[in-house]
């Protein structure tokens, strides 16, 4: 299949560079989510490999919300670069996975977090780097639930749309 991780890594690295040079008081945390979610340092991003993982968007959002809760920054936002529809959630100590279509249980948990972020005043901008019709359908529902934004970008055009959105949100004071 198409290489989706390389463009996503390039965008995250470029966003990191933009923020550290143009907006030095801002903080950027990079989170990776497969079956689970974890934080990585910018310096480790080039070495990130894709595993045989599902997409646990819930874990990524929960970790992002935890990090944002601890910050005193008035302007909080989430940029989510994703190449897959949500296919996995954790139930207790076990994983519930379903790669076929859009699983109602997985999607509903994910949409619930989109609504929670909206109520907390945390906009989510989603960048979709795949042309999967199920992913497009999910991203539309997710964006509506959060009142966020979505960019359906080609792998090449991903970077420029990300930076325009970041700068626009900075000017708006979000």
Q: Which positions does each model-derived feature cover?
A:
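Short glycine-/polar-rich loops that comprise or flank the Walker A/P-loop
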Residues: 24-26, 76, 120-123, 146-149
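…and closely analogous acidic/polar surface helices at protein-protein or active-site interfaces
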Residues: 1-30, 49-56, 68, 107
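Catalytic core of nucleotidyl cyclases, primarily class III adenylyl/guanylyl cyclases
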Residues: 32, 38, 94-97
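Switch/connector loops and helix/strand junctions flanking conserved nucleotide-binding motifs
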Residues: 1, 38-42, 86-91, 134-137, ...
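Structural beta-sheet core signal
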Residues: 30-32, 78-80, 126-128
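Von Willebrand factor
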Residues: 28, 37-40, 45-79, 86-88, ...
């Amino acid at each position: 299949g198409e290489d989706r991780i390389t463009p996503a890594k390039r965008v995250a690295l470029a966003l990191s560079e933009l923020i550290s040079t143009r907006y030095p008081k801002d903080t950027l945390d990079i989170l990776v989510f497969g079956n689970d979610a974890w934080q990585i340092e910018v310096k480790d991003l080039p070495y990130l490999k894709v595993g045989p993982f599902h997409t646990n968007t819930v874990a990524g959002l929960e970790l992002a919300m935890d990090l944002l809760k601890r910050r005193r920054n008035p302007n909080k936002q989430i940029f989510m670069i994703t190449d897959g529809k949500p296919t996995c959630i954790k139930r207790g100590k076990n994983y519930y996975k379903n790669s076929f279509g859009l699983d109602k249980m997985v999607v509903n948990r994910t949409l619930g977090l989109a609504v929670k972020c909206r109520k907390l005043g945390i906009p989510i901008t989603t960048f979709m780097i795949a042309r999967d019709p199920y992913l497009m359908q999910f991203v539309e529902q997710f964006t509506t639930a959060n009142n966020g934004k979505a960019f359906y970008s080609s792998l090449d055009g991903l970077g420029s749309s990300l930076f325009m959105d970041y700068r626009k949100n900075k000017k708006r004071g979000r």
